[in-house]
Amino acid sequence: MKSFRKLLHYLKPYMFFAIIGPLFMVLEVAMDLIQPTIMQHIIDVGIANRDLNYVIKMGLLMIGAAALGLVGGLGCMMYSTKAAVNFATDIRKDVFAKIETFSSENRDSFGTGKLLTIVTNDITSIQSAMTMTLRVLVRGPLLFIGSIIIVFVTARELFPILLVVVPILLLAIIFIASKASGTFKKVQEALDKVNTKLQENLSGVRVIKAYVRQKYEITQFGNVNTNLTKINIRAVQLISLMMPIIMLVVSGGIVATLWIGGEKVFDGTLQVGAILAFINYLNIILMSLMSISMVFMQIARAFPSADRVQQVLNTEVDITTETNAVAPKRIEGQIDFKNVSYSYTKNNEYVLKNISFNICKGEKVGIIGSTGSGKSTLAKLLPRLYDVDQGEVCIDGINVRAYDLQKLRASIGFVPQKALLFSGSIEENLRYGKEDATNDELEVAASSACATEFINKLEDSYQYHLTQGATNLSGGQKQRVSIARALVRKPSILILDDSTSAVDAKSESNIQSALRTEYKGTTTLLIASKISSIIDADKILVLDNGELVGDGTHEELLEQCEVYQEIYLSQGGNLHKEGGKEHA
């Protein structure tokens, strides 16, 4: 409840809509409340006295009241919906903006599936609760209180029936609502698991098909889906239990009304119209209590969602720009790692252990090692995708923590292992690297990445539309566009994290040549699993089990580093450097 209350400040800009909507609802409620009384007069006066003119006059009054009620209902729906939708839109906007500031560790702590559920289902649940609050939470109590007052004034003889029926209805609704509210939190948690499994399958569909694991994945999805179904059924059963109980109580009230009211009619102390009006008001009370209970159900469902939204909004982002941050006009690109250690789990299981090295401005440095040796992790420390646990990472002699974060990252071109392109044109993807890049700059970057040839062959060239995940490009094409996107910003530091693994040997050689000539002032880190990709680097760093075990040129490492020798032999053992070219 506290979390939901904290979100109410998002409603402030839309208070006009939030106030005017319920005011329209007051009009609708007033019209609903007078209709049973009008019907009572039609029966007791018009029909009893056979006064057709009176019946027509009161009938027209009923139609007018219904029309006014319709206007009130439509006005309430329009303004309340505007308030609730804008309220939810602003929350969603802030949640998304907060997620965008998350470090990799922050995102890992939530998981992609949970974040997707929060941004979609949870905020939608909060929106529904707000809509029902503005529309129904005003209508329900007004109908309830108004009906009781009218019955007390016009049919006091039948009022004791309400004193019995209403408390029973309230107790039944409160009991069922309290039981159901705890189930909704479990529903959201189960939905998280379904979303996570679905997201994994959609992103890994090629692997699943390649290994013929569709049946296994269907079974796994079936398990989490069945769990969600069971919890949903439990929640629905509790809510469904409400209607039969309420109808039973109300039916008992109607029977009591007909019994007691019938005797009063025979005695001449009550008229038939009053009994029918009382039954109508009893039904209005029933509907008002049901609507109030549904609002509280929805609010109870929104409380866990609000908790999860607040969990995102209140998350302390662990990688931010520090006070008095350094923002030089240009970062030169000298890199120093000083006794750097890092652990993903923060339990002293370090994936990088006491790493120290230095790279001069403009050097081309290869980084190699077996799978899991820490190559990619090391590269992610430079743009502060993660922060070190021990030691320092310095650029131009300044700790990366001291830099303005945007300035630091704008000076680094990062090409990850998996080429990630966004839906849209190739040009839009290239401009992701530099929004104000000229067409000439785009073409130079594409040419350096050996992407020009295939781009020009596409139907719309640079305007060629990429599908989600760029599935309409090959792996090598995606990697080349990804490299071009990094090059277009002319970075001080370029990180290629095994970014040419799907590129043919000739294109890879041309890319390496372009890096040596067109970007010779750029400090370049070439992370690779193949020696052939880094053999011409100014120096090579060798990682093994998170430790730096080699630092030197290809020839020096062949003589001095046992791990490098093993990698060299495993890849043919006949590579040599001659005239800047690689031979086998």
What are these regions (language model features)?
Residues 328-584:
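ABC-type nucleotide-binding domain
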Residues 49-50, 85, 93-117, 121-123, ...:
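Short intracellular "coupling" helices and adjacent cytoplasmic loop segments at the cytosolic face
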Residues 1-34, 39, 47-61, 72, ...:
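Membrane-integrated ABC transporters
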Residues 28, 32-36, 64, 69-84, ...:
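Alpha-helical transmembrane segments
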Residues 13, 80, 101-105, 121-130, ...:
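An intracellular "coupling" helix at the cytosolic face of ABC transporter transmembrane type-1 domains
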Residues 51, 55-57, 150-164, 234-308, ...:
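Helix-loop-helix
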Residues 13, 17-30, 62, 69-71, ...:
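Transmembrane helices of ABC transporter permease
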